[in-house]
Amino acid sequence: MVAGLLGGSAVRAQQVYQPNWDSLKGYQVPDWFRDAKFGIFIHWGVYSVPAFGSEWYPRNMYLQGSAENKHQVETYGPIEKFGYKDFIPRFTASKFDPVAWVTLFKKAGARYVVPVAEHHDGFAMYKTALSRWNAFNMGPHRDVVGELAAEIKKQGLVFGLSSHRIEHWWFMNGGRHFASDFVDMKNTDFYGPAREQNETPSPEYMNDWLMRCTELVDKYQPQLFWFDWWIEQPAMDPYRKTFASFYYNKGLEWNKGVVINYKNAAYPDNTAVLDLERGKLAGIRNPAWQTDDAIGNKSWGYAAGNTFKDARYVITNLVDIVSKNGNLLLNIGPRSDGTITDEETATLLGTGKWLEVNGEAIYGTRPWKVFGEGPTESASGSFADQKIPFTAKDVRFTAKGPVVYAIMLGIPSGNSVIKALAAGAGNGTVARISVLGSSETVRWKQQNDGLVILPSAHAPADYAMAYKIELR
């Protein structure tokens, strides 16, 4: 029955991949993803209208006793008269300019862009035949995902999207437990099913999930499809496999490499690409993986009072992630009118300025024999933002053939000593060293206790310095 839901669409795709793990383990991560290293995530939706707390406002406003519930009642009145649906007309996107957005992302040095197609709230940010609750039919009356897809591709970046639809099974359930606008049957197809989180999704709901996912693939041809955590439900196993085989076969039909991002253990190794939310790894991981993190510290969507990561944080953590065979998918949360905050813009432009000088050490690289060295311990695991800043004594390595890039996660003021490239370490003989973005002659000595690099007179970029080390 699951496969049958795909109808003729699945029949048209080349049937190389079958919906079983043995077949799906033939998947190879495409080179475009391994080369890209840096992408932009976009959390934008109706939740940006109240702009309070986080993008989980639509759930939390229905949880009695929560700060969001108190704010909702004090600001908008009784929830039975003004519920989440009533924010939709206020979600105008009046200043949404996809050209300006993608131009900014390109200046930031991003190589792929992933807007959220549907978040946990159940409001689709695209034109769909499967739900009337969508941005084309109401609110801004625009196919937001479609407009972004067209512009992202036009400007030469890779288009992806995310679906958080499965979490909607339980996300809005608080409204069932007190007097709210849930009692109005006209809202049932938006707020429902609103079941308990420990309840297994029904076959009807999982079939609907699959149909929405395949519709997105057919309409927009994304090269990356990002899933949030709840698809790992055991009952979802046949649906996960069916979607993966469908999508990977579509990639073959399009002659484009495609990527599924998953969390936790939703997919086995070598069948899709692992994603860690606000987290990193302690060492190199094969196969390739990804971190999704947000410039905003408190919310993925726009929320008043949010604080933000600066370019230094993003750059040093990007380097750390890339040295371990990972990518960084960095999130922004635009306002409800479609404008991007000054803080996020500054961080993006600062990151892009550094990548303009040092991108050679990032794009198209692969991990070296070791990821790095230095005194600062890297955060590891999901929900593990780097609390201790890196320093100039921390170095991370990337490689292209016989070239090793040693990236200092600060600007050295004294000698830099790289133990992994000591004369007796067995990792190669140094032939030449240069600084990316500079014509300055680098002074160095390869000694038994390490490769000693004397400080440069000028740093060509802020925050981190990349040495290009050519080995014999």
Question: What spans do the regions from the language model cover?
Answer:
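Bacterial N-terminal signal peptides
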Residues: M1-G7
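Sec/Tat signal peptide C-region and signal peptidase I cleavage site
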Residues: S9-A13
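Mature catalytic domains of secreted/periplasmic carbohydrate-active enzymes
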Residues: Q14-R472
